[in-house]
Amino acid sequence: MHNKKFLLIGPTESVLTKRGNRFPDFANFLHKNGAQIEYYTTDFYHAEKRRFTIKEIFEAKTICPYKLIVWHVLGYSGNISIRRLISNFLFSSILFIRLISRVKKADSIIIPSRPVELIFFVSLIKLIKGSKIYLDIQDIWPDALQINHKFRKKVFTYYCNIFLRNSLKRYTYTFHTAPSFVNWLRRYSKNTPSVFLPLGWDTSRWEDKLTGVVPQTEMNQNEFNLVVVAQLQHQIDIMPVLDFLRTNSNYSLTIIGEDGNGERYGDVTAFIKHNEIRNVKFVGVVAREKMSDHLRDKDIGLLPMITTSIPNKIFDYLGAKLPIVVLGKNDSSDFVDKFDIGWSCNYNSESFESLMKSISWGNLVKKKANVEKVRMHFCRDNLHEEFFKIVTAKCNNLHKS
């Protein structure tokens, strides 16, 4: 294992970023197990649409136990824009040019499922050099991007298909973070093996940090403290929840992670102000290590997301030992229902209100017990072991989906 080299490519995710640490965790785990790591990322912070400072980059390289390579890239201001596509293409093509002469057949490359240009150019490295390549499916283009303009959506879909159609079949193995993502994979490749490897929760953030939790009592049942961990981007629609809170002041909602720049932030605050809702609290962006402090006195974690996936916030709730309510029918609702760790309802205020008023203290205790039973299956320590077995296996036919 000491001679094994892994190249991890994370254009928007690294030790520099505050959101998303799956790839840095992969890199740390492989490094601790004796692998040689090269981690490629960029100087552009996608979440905040800004460049990292020289100081931030220097400090990141200083604390990194492996080799961190930070490239300058073209910045952009919109998630859906020509400039972003150009930036993605330039990064991916330059990566190919620089790596093709350096990568050896014995090396392994691990990349995320976006941008699609990266999927294509890394598949060319496999075609030419024979290296093993692994894809971590956390997001799916073009499906995941919400484009209302029909012509633009058609053009973007065509653009994505150009890069995906003949690329995914070359991948040695893939990991999908939500079951429905396999449908996307099979659209382009019938035989590429894949295994369910969810995002999971970090034991260092949660274990031994939940002491002093304020317990609910029979005295205040049906007066639950609700929480949403999310920035109010397009895919997060909390309006059904706010409509419920408008007429149910005995419930409270805390929103963690909104910095005032979310796409829905203006509409949400306007609705709260217009209806004089006083039982909603904004906390703002919270450091990962401080999240447990903000969830320790909450009763139920909410996921009001219009797109399908099983995001990090689900595992924040699991880490905090909270039952979960999912609005809508999607991968997250299937996950919660399968393990009986919460509830799901239709995506409207009437269904949400009916559900909330049906939840008693006894129901909550039962769901909490189920959370306790299953949560360790989804801690990252265990998931990393599964990941390690696959990327170090001599024959990658362990778990076909």
What are these regions (language model features)?
Residues 7, 175, 217-236, 242-246, ...:
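Conserved donor-binding/catalytic core segment of Leloir-type glycosyltransferases
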